[in-house]
Amino acid sequence: MVKIEDLTVKYPDGTTAVDNITMNINDGEHLALIGANGAGKSSLILSMVGVLPSDGSVEIDGVKLGKSTLTDIRRLAGVVFQNPDDQLFLPTIYDDIAFGPRNMGLDEESVRYRVEDRLRLLGIEHLRDRTALKLSGGEKRMAAMATVLAMKPSVMILDEPTAFLDPKARRNLINVLKSLPHTMLIATHDLTFAAEVCRRAVVLRKGSVFADGPTDELLFDDELMDAAGIESINVYIGNIFKK
């Protein structure tokens, strides 16, 4: 379970990026984090794993975020960044996925088992000996997810996971995420994706929680979404078919 209480993030110039956010994410829940650019989504994500300094409290599976618990927090909560190139930097995908387990001190046999298990789970065994430089956006996304899953986190945090994906790769990602048992926090502008993968959504506005409720209610609420600076699914679909 993830517990966030009175979380505030301020940048050196005095800008408040996250303003006194309190929310919980239940075990196994897939929560969509929705908001316009600058609403605080990325700042919230980074503060949850100690990348950005913050005031308030973050607790993941009973471990409270602090200087002495950073390693534990980052093992419990794995972040899949918006740009998969940030997580794929070694000669082969095998090495990228093995990087975390090796740093945990696992022996090579255990590392090999974890890597091959994650490759199999995501259906990317054929990428084992490939370099990220030769992969498509969808292949990179799956490989980046495998690097996180190899650490066996209980919580997955994904920042704009459908970025760089073509429709087929996007559908594959949806199917994979729906099949995983992990607790998930998914920051996204892709509202139809959020509606399919997440039953609950939190809408941010100016760094604060503007709305929290069932995804299929919030994302279709034209007035609420407009007030948050986002185009609702209804408006989005209407514009597609507008003559």
What are these regions (language model features)?
Residues 131-135, 139:
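Conserved ABC ATPase signature
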